[in-house]
Amino acid sequence: MQLNVSGAQAIEVSERTFGGEFNETLVHQAVVAYMAGGRQGSKAQKTRSEVSGGGKKPWRQKGTGRARAGTIRSPIWRGGGTTFAAKPRSHEQKLNKKMYRAALRSILAELVRLDRLVVVADFAVDAPKTKGLVAKLDTLGLKDVLIVTDGVDENLYLAARNLAHVDVRDVQGSDPVSLIAYDKVLVTVSAVKKFEELLG
């Protein structure tokens, strides 16, 4: 299949990488797994044995007419412990490499279908200046965009750092969440070739 390149000749790309069907279930699974992996998992609550105090029986067992109680830190008391207290844990979800790559292929193919993938021969800025990058994006009519390059471009990264709706990634730093988060994805021809190498 062919991909149109902005201001240049169309390029031949792999049907497998850029022309497959959209697997919504798999993409959803990949996005959830990716976001779960980013969770800190450090929340913690205290059980009745961990809450401070409550060592003394508040009143005797029998004869008061009140319900029996052994501690003021029982979960049914105000200020008591939590019955099933949350503890620090990993929220990581397993996703096979094969599935992860298939999800990325599915996203790329859908971006092509929805006309959200913009391919350019090359994309760089002369200096790490936001103004220069904004002007360059304006000529392409792009506002909310993820820029994907073949390798890390320091100038481009620094120029985009102050823009809320622009992000810069290299091919290996691209993930399911970033690829679907922006209105448009701007990729260079060399990045397209790299995607084919990694996902083909």
UniProtKB/Swiss-Prot annotation:
Quick one: a GO biological-process term for this protein?
translation
| Keywords annotated in UniProt | Ribonucleoprotein, Ribosomal protein, RNA-binding, rRNA-binding
Disordered, as annotated region:
38-65
Q: Name one GO cellular component term.
A: ribosome
GO molecular-function term, one example from the UniProt record? structural constituent of ribosome
Database matches in InterPro entries: Ribosomal_uL4, Ribosomal_uL4-like, Ribosomal_uL4_dom_sf
Q: Which residues cross the membrane?
A: none
Listed under subunit, the entry gives:
Part of the 50S ribosomal subunit.
Per the entry, what this protein does is:
One of the primary rRNA binding proteins, this protein initially binds near the 5'-end of the 23S rRNA. It is important during the early stages of 50S assembly. It makes multiple contacts with different domains of the 23S rRNA in the assembled 50S subunit and ribosome. Forms part of the polypeptide exit tunnel.
- NCBIfam families named in the record: rplD_bact
The record ties this protein, via PANTHER family, to:
50S RIBOSOMAL PROTEIN L4 (PTHR10746), LARGE RIBOSOMAL SUBUNIT PROTEIN UL4M (PTHR10746:SF6)
**Similarity field:** Belongs to the universal ribosomal protein uL4 family.
The protein's name: Large ribosomal subunit protein uL4
Native species: Pseudomonas aeruginosa (strain LESB58)
